Amino acid sequence: MLYKDIKVSHLMNSNDELQKLVKDFEAELWTLNFKKSVGSLDQSHKIRAIRRDIARIKTELNAREKGAK
């Protein structure tokens, strides 16, 4: 799942769902980084995309938190 999917569908979810999504992405990022260190990663562009997706979701969560105050 990349930015196109996150932009529309996931940013409308609740904060709990977004936090779960961040955890899922972080787990996937960990797996990709492990594969990279072992040398079996074929699609290295996914690491950058997932890092950016995590940042986008966290930015939305922070904006919601500041907006609620």
UniProtKB/Swiss-Prot annotation:
From the record, what ranges are coiled-coil? none
Quote the protein name from its UniProt record.
Large ribosomal subunit protein uL29
**Which family is annotated?**
Belongs to the universal ribosomal protein uL29 family.
Query: Which source organism does the UniProt entry give?
Result: Mycoplasmopsis agalactiae (strain NCTC 10123 / CIP 59.7 / PG2)
Please tell me whether the keyword Ribosomal protein is annotated for this protein.
yes
Q: Please give the Gene Ontology molecular function terms for this protein.
A: structural constituent of ribosome
Its BP terms in the Gene Ontology are: translation
Does the keyword Cytoplasm feature in the UniProt annotation?
Answer: no
Classification via Gene3D superfamilies: 1.10.287.310
The record, for InterPro entries, names: Ribosomal_uL29 (IPR001854), Ribosomal_uL29_CS (IPR018254), Ribosomal_uL29_sf (IPR036049)
Mind telling me which GO cellular component terms the entry cites? Answer: ribonucleoprotein complex; ribosome
Any one Pfam family here would be Ribosomal_L29
> Could you tell me the keywords of this UniProt record?
Ribonucleoprotein, Ribosomal protein
